Amino acid sequence: MKIFFAFILAFFASFHYSQAQALDETHVEPYCHIHTIPPSISSEAISSKATSSEATSSEATVLTESAASRVDSILASSPLLYKSSLGLMVYDLTDNKTIISYGEKNTLRPASTMKLVTAIAAIDRLGGSYLFRTSLRYTGEIKDNVLNGDVYCIGGFDPRFNSDDLTAFVEGIRSLGIDTIRGCLVADKMMKNEDRLGWGWCWDDDNPVLSPLLISRKDEFMQHFVSELVDAGIVFIGNIIEGDTPIDAYEIVDRTHTIDQILMKMMKDSDNLYAEALFYQLASSSGNRPATAQDARNIIKRLIRKIGLNPSDYIFADGSGLSLYNYVTAELEVEMLKYAYQNSNIYLHLYPSLPIAGIDGTLKRRMKTPFTTDNVRAKTGTLTGVQSLAGYCTTPNNHTLCFAIINNGILKDSQARSLQDKICEALCSP
């Protein structure tokens, strides 16, 4: 028995940017299953020596084909198939094979599923024990409770740094017996360059602050620091400046947060500031000071090449997916998810950070059905005209799938989300 299902759609798009590279004309490929439905097997043909593993494999194939057939029907009935650009790919990580693909090589804007690329590249490069660090140092001499020297606040682009951390900074100064500072308070922002907006961001959007020295998400660190010093009774006589910290500066205190703490907020809540902070940690790992977005892009491109794809086929503009210049494919996102799954040092940190269908994050109110709730774990993406979803789910026969669904040119977000939810339901149902 065979299922014949074919659509030939052609979408041509020419993308022109004032600063971006031109993309080739994109063709939407006809829908294609990469699967074969097994023919009916008579009882006479069944060998008495058939093993249980063969039976299990047969059952798994039937379940896979059933899911693919359901996705066929969903796509056939969706107006988005011919009214928008779609990229879809589903890969069986247990059987190591692609089971569904449609337009998987179409170059599309990913929106916040770009955060998956950032997260996987960062964990791969930095490691699961990596710490976001903001440091306090000083130079000069302490005599009679007076510091005749400078205090340096070294920014590490930690989006979680808050008033409690700042209080710890002030307590660190008090612990040295200092009640007066005669010198400068220096804001060391040398971790990254001075870019305030990401490449391809709209200036009038509610964009995250790209400063390596933040307090409660705002670029007001030094003002708050001086206020805390005054409240603690520490006299400051000097100027507030920006500069680089000398290598011989003395340590006062460090405040750190783990990469897991960053990932949880970044992925569950789709927090753009956290994503850009991680993007610049990646950039900083290049050793360049100040680091740039291009440093991060170069590291991501090396990983793309490592997993067997051509990085020149994509554009990586930022870490969050806010940029209108990001262009990836469903195939790329699936390959990244595969790479993460196959490397436990990445997967153990990525998987817990993903929103859980019907439970938390951006999927809390979605897919509240018996087969998808607490099963689908995926990153959502939303921009004007863009809806995307990429992540993992488990089939009734305990196969782990990874998938990516990217939809561009949509007029109604609810319509695209409904399509995503139905596809996930089809993958998770018996």
Question: Where are the regions that the model predicts?
Answer:
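Beta-lactamase-like hydrolase cores
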Residues: L23-E44, S58-T107, E171-L176, S429
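C-terminal soluble interaction/assembly domains
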Residues: I315-F316, L322-P430
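Active-site SXXK
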Residues: N96, P110-G128, L185, H224-E228, ...
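Soluble periplasmic/extracytoplasmic beta-strand elements of cell-envelope proteins
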Residues: G87-Y91, I100-S101, D150-I154, C184-D188, ...
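A small/polar active-site loop signature that marks catalytic segments
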Residues: I215-S353
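Active-site-adjacent, His/Asp/Glu-enriched structural segments that form or flank metal-binding
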Residues: L131-K192, W201-P208, I215
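Extracytoplasmic
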Residues: K83-S85, G103-K105, A111-M114, S129-L131, ...
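Bacterial Sec-dependent N-terminal signal peptides
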Residues: M1-T26
